[in-house]
């Protein structure tokens, strides 16, 4: 390429590169979440990033279709990048139904793509962690998902959380009583964006769908039980909703049973019943939830989900019910950064063998293998100036520097200089003592 004709190395809006420190932190977060998921019996799966558009849109239209990255491939097929991991799960279950065992508890860490407006902690390409229980319509499965959310976030270090729970069926019942079933999908989407709207904007949007009297009833429903904007107990709010919806129902009874299980394991203080939680996707049919960090409520939900009883029926004859949730890894990580929970620097390598003479590379590599049994070690690949090698070690956060002072046919007897790079203090020791000391001090 001619000088001056280089392409600008810019990144698309809503997309980003991740430098090593950030990617390491994210990987450590994924490890913590993975451990928690495995402790609760979930197993991993993977699905293609690219699917047939008709598969992804079978039950999601409107805003979802507008936000999809969609194109016609070279074979003339209408395809799109997945916008979530729930719809691909339904397709996955239908495809592999005969080979799966039920209830099937899966987790899936993967990137998804949505063409929405980027904001803090929200990108057009982002990573989700989904976990679901497919093949059980029991209250216990709903409870397990809610319990899992708390356990995972606690394992990740987020102890100050509040999980808001509701039931789509209750809201549907309420809208039917108002003769608004035909407008349910639009109303649900408006309510789902309630936190981002000024009250007068919310009211105006609802009034475009129904009269002011019914708008007021909807507002009473979504704020049921609030006192000066503060949500009271789960039971108090549920009783208020039962009054608004004509008494005890199958949906309210199910929520009450979920709450009883939360109380049975003494974690109920992390949960509130919030009738305004509707979730924007139209495949949800039962319990729905959103999770907020109490120290950063403005950042939005870091984990959301719910029950979907008919989703697999779109791809197979018999419907398989499911319930699950999704953690937005990027938003959660951004929140941890704001809270000062992420470390400034993480380094997996503890020692660097400085290269003083390329003729000694065989000795360096033997020592590296010898140390690596107990201490993560690497060799600088060429004999550059020591100042450059020091700068490399400092940027990478490596603690120990190793210099070969006297080689020996027996690698563990080589005489070395062990330098603590944070203090520049030197100690002359044979290799076996160097390994012992580094392993002991970490």
UniProtKB/Swiss-Prot annotation:
Belongs to the class-II aminoacyl-tRNA synthetase family. PROSITE patterns: AA_TRNA_LIGASE_II. It is found in: Cytoplasm. Homodimer. One of its GO terms (biological process) is histidyl-tRNA aminoacylation. Pfam families: tRNA-synt_His. It comes from Treponema pallidum (strain Nichols). This is Histidine--tRNA ligase. Disulfide bonds: none annotated. One of its GO terms (cellular component) is cytoplasm. The lineage of its organism: Bacteria, Pseudomonadati, Spirochaetota, Spirochaetia, Spirochaetales.
């Amino acid at each position: 390429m001619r000088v001056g004709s280089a392409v600008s190395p810019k990144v698309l809006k809503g997309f980003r590169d991740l430098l090593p420190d950030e990617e390491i932190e994210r990987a450590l977060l994924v490890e913590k979440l993975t451990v928690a998921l495995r402790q609760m019996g979930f197993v991993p799966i993977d699905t293609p990033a690219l699917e047939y558009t008709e598969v992804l849109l079978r039950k999601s239209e409107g805003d979802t279709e507008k936000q999809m990255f969609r194109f016609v491939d070279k074979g003339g097929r209408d395809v799109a990048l997945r916008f979530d991991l729930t719809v691909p799960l339904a397709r996955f279950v239908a495809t592999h139904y005969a080979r799966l065992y039920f209830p099937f508890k899966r987790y899936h860490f993967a990137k998804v793509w949505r063409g929405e407006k980027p904001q803090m902690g929200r990108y057009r390409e982002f990573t989700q962690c989904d976990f679901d229980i497919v093949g059980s319509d029991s209250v216990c499965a709903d409870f397990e998902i809610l319990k899992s959310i708390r356990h995972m976030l606690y394992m990740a270090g987020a102890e100050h959380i509040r999980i808001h729970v509701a039931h789509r069926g209750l809201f549907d019942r309420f809208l039917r009583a108002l003769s608004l079933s035909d407008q349910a999908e639009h109303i649900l989407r408006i309510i789902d964006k309630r936190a981002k709207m000024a009250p007068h904007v919310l009211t105006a949007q609802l009034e475009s769908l129904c009269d002011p009297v019914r708008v007021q009833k909807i507002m009473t429903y979504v704020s049921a039980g609030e006192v000066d904007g503060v949500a009271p107990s789960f039971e108090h709010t549920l009783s208020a909703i039962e009054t608004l919806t004509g008494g005890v129902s199958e949906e309210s009874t199910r929520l009450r049973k979920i709450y009883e299980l939360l109380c049975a394991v003494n974690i109920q203080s992390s949960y509130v019943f919030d009738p305004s939680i509707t979730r924007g996707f139209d495949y949800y049919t039962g319990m729905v939830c959103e999770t907020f960090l109490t120290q950063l409520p403005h950042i939005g939900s870091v984990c959301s989900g719910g029950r979907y009883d008919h989703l697999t029926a779109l791809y197979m004859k018999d419907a398989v019910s499911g319930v699950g949730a999704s953690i937005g890894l990027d938003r959660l990580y951004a929140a941890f950064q704001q809270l000062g929970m992420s470390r400034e620097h993480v380094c997996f390598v503890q020692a660097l063998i400085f290269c003083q003479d390329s003729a000694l590379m065989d000795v360096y590599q033997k020592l590296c293998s010898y140390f690596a049994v107990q201490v993560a070690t690497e060799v600088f690949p060429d004999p550059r100036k020591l100042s450059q090698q020091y700068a490399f070690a400092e940027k990478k956060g490596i603690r120990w520097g190793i210099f070969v002072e006297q080689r020996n046919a027996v690698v563990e007897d080589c005489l070395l200089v062990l330098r603590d790079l944070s203090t520049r203090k030197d100690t002359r020791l044979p290799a076996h003592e160097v390994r012992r000391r580094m392993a002991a001090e970490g």
